[in-house]
């Protein structure tokens, strides 16, 4: 390809998966597979550019884990844990950004903290939303899920909401002697955030008609 033989900017052709290999397509449709591939490409580009300039690279951290919010007498306690990248020591977070939204408003520009715990004062009757991102010299991670809290001084009891749904999945896999593919009608899957990875549902599953 002339784009890589005669490039005006550094370029490369990445061939990681084959659209003719169903095991490869299962990886390509897996949200975690997409994330790992994208992050490995990002790391490679980062190392290439920094090595050309003779500078030390730092990989951006992964999103925090185990995020929780509790409140006591109008004070919200936010806590989380760091998610370490076992393949990249430089990706360790050095600080965190707490994003806050009040009522129907959008999120603010964030507050930087250096610990994995933080207290926030709450106004009675106002709904608050929080999310946290990890930060280091390499950049900012994806955020945690958004958690909400409301302080009602007149309440006699508290309500605890636990999100026990952390599933990520491709569309339903169909793979037997006669059929093969991804059935969106049976299960569209759960992507890692918004995705534009499809241009429509698979219509034909018959193995004998593949390639026609």
Which residue stretches match the model-derived regions?
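Active-site-adjacent mobile loop/cap segments within catalytic or ligand-binding domains
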Residues: 1-52
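Short, solvent-exposed loop/turn elements at domain surfaces
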Residues: 22-24, 89, 167-173
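Pro/Thr/Ser/Gly-rich low-complexity, intrinsically disordered linker/stalk tracts
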Residues: 47-91, 124, 138-157
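Short beta-strand elements bearing conserved aromatic residues within extracellular beta-rich modules
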Residues: 94-98
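Predominantly extracellular/luminal cell-surface or secreted proteins
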Residues: 99-103, 162
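Short beta-strand segments within Ig-like beta-sandwich modules, predominantly Fibronectin type-III
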Residues: 108-115
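Beta-strand-rich modules
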Residues: 119-141
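Aromatic-Pro/Gly-enriched surface loop or interdomain linker
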Residues: 145-212
